[in-house]
Amino acid sequence: MPKPINVRVTTMDAELEFAIQPNTTGKQLFDQVVKTVGLREVWFFGLQYVDSKGYSTWLKLNKKVTQQDVKKENPLQFKFRAKFFPEDVSEELIQEITQRLFFLQVKEAILNDEIYCPPETAVLLASYAVQAKYGDYNKEIHKPGYLANDRLLPQRVLEQHKLTKEQWEERIQNWHEEHRGMLREDSMMEYLKIAQDLEMYGVNYFEIKNKKGTELWLGVDALGLNIYEHDDKLTPKIGFPWSEIRNISFNDKKFVIKPIDKKAPDFVFYAPRLRINKRILALCMGNHELYMRRRKPDTIEVQQMKAQAREEKHQKQLERAQLENEKKKREIAEKEKERIEREKEELMERLRQIEEQTMKAQKELEEQTRKALELDQERKRAKEEAERLEKERQAAEEAKSALAKQAADQMKNQEQLAAELAEFTAKIALLEEAKKKKEEEATEWQHKAFAAQEDLEKTKEELKTVMSAPPPPPPPPVIPPTENEHDEHDENNAEASAELSNDGVMNHRSEEERVTETQKNERVKKQLQALSSELAQARDETKKTQNDVLHAENVKAGRDKYKTLRQIRQGNTKQRIDEFEAM
């Protein structure tokens, strides 16, 4: 039994380890990887490895892994990466896993400056990356420094601006807040929609020379072949769409492209090494195939995938809406709970006040009862005194009568009796006065007693009202919220050729009608303008790179990726080939 070979495959967000047999083909390994990660849009991807000479190469799917020049390590190392890029991410990337892998790969390329990205766009893209990672901004969770360990901007951008880590975070956080309510997968798609308009996005660059020996760059991408001057990778000077190319071939370092236009000469360039031509041929074949596939009706498989993706997205939206609804319900329940607690406290306070008032009224009642008793006692004393005085008066009357009789009987002692009579008369007058006074006093005490009795009755009535008032209702119970292979061909010979068919294709050059996301989306346009003016104040102009200068010139001239594309494809194929030869 042959000994198995250990293999490690690194995707953009995981490390996979497999044991393969010595006779395992590239396709078998590739199929095992895509099955493990759950990927169906396999035509974009490939397995990359470093060969024994240190060059990065794509694994050929039709050959055994062991027959390829993979650097001898244990385990054998491969990277699972996007080999071909879509023309329009929002139209072509169907599965969420595909979108995420592209998002992570493009983000890494931007952060490493493999794709040039202007500073304002870099900050906006960073905010989408943050939304994709953290979800909605929440100041309770996302405290200052929450982005401290995240790599969000290219080093070039950091060095070109006089801003601290905290100031960068503040700017990114402000835009992060703007994306509230955006699903994580939608944030990744928004990132890609902006990134795909960057000039270097999805372009494979190769150093070439024309017949004159001028050093140039060949750019191979989803839309065709473009020629760049050696000091400018941003702005292509000549373009050939895939629909104009009939045959591609190479012989050693010479690469020949035959146009569909029979009147046009062959398009010939030279690469520094044979292996470069092999890579160019493989990329041309793969990109041409995808270019043509996009311009034909979707296969049944793609239609099914799109329908499934739509259903999954709809389901996620429903789940999110349900989650938001539950969240709102929970917030309402929390507020209701707080309101009930507040009302409960208010009712308890009122109850305390009523109890205090009741106690106060009770004390007042007791005091008034005491006073009423005292007044009643005083009234009784006054009455007794009045009765005593009445008796004395009667006695005096009797004495007066007796004296009067005595006076009549004793005329002789008239003077003496008259004096006594006068004395008793005076005494009677005094007693009359005292009696009157006591009667008035008794009447006054009687009135006071009546008033006290009325106060007592009133207080009793108030107390009765307070005590019989219904107790405050208990707070209602708080109900808890419910919560393709495109083989580079194993050419032992130093030549290879491929026919590129253009049959059955609709609307060959639809890409020339495209506009950038900034032109389509007013919100993105305003965001980028605001960021640009904000960053301009902190920019160190002495640290501009060649790409910064070239980008600024393009912006000033009103050029963008698609306007340039239309411009470099003008004229017939022969004119553009002549132009290439003259460079």
Swiss-Prot record:
Q: Which domain of life is it from?
A: Eukaryota
Which modifications occur after translation, per UniProt?
Phosphorylated by tyrosine-protein kinases. Phosphorylation by ROCK2 suppresses the head-to-tail association of the N-terminal and C-terminal halves resulting in an opened conformation which is capable of actin and membrane-binding.
> Locations of Basic and acidic residues compositional bias?
374-400, 483-492, 506-525
Record field: compositional bias (Pro residues) = 469-480
Residues the entry annotates as binding a 1,2-diacyl-sn-glycero-3-phospho-(1D-myo-inositol): 60-63, 278
Q: Which Pfam families match?
A: ERM_C, ERM_helical, FERM_C, FERM_M, FERM_N
Provide the FERM domain boundaries. Answer: 5-295
Query: Phosphothreonine-modified residues are where?
Result: 564
- For the region Disordered, what residue ranges are annotated? 309-336, 374-407, 460-526
Q: What is this protein called?
A: Radixin
Gene name, please? RDX
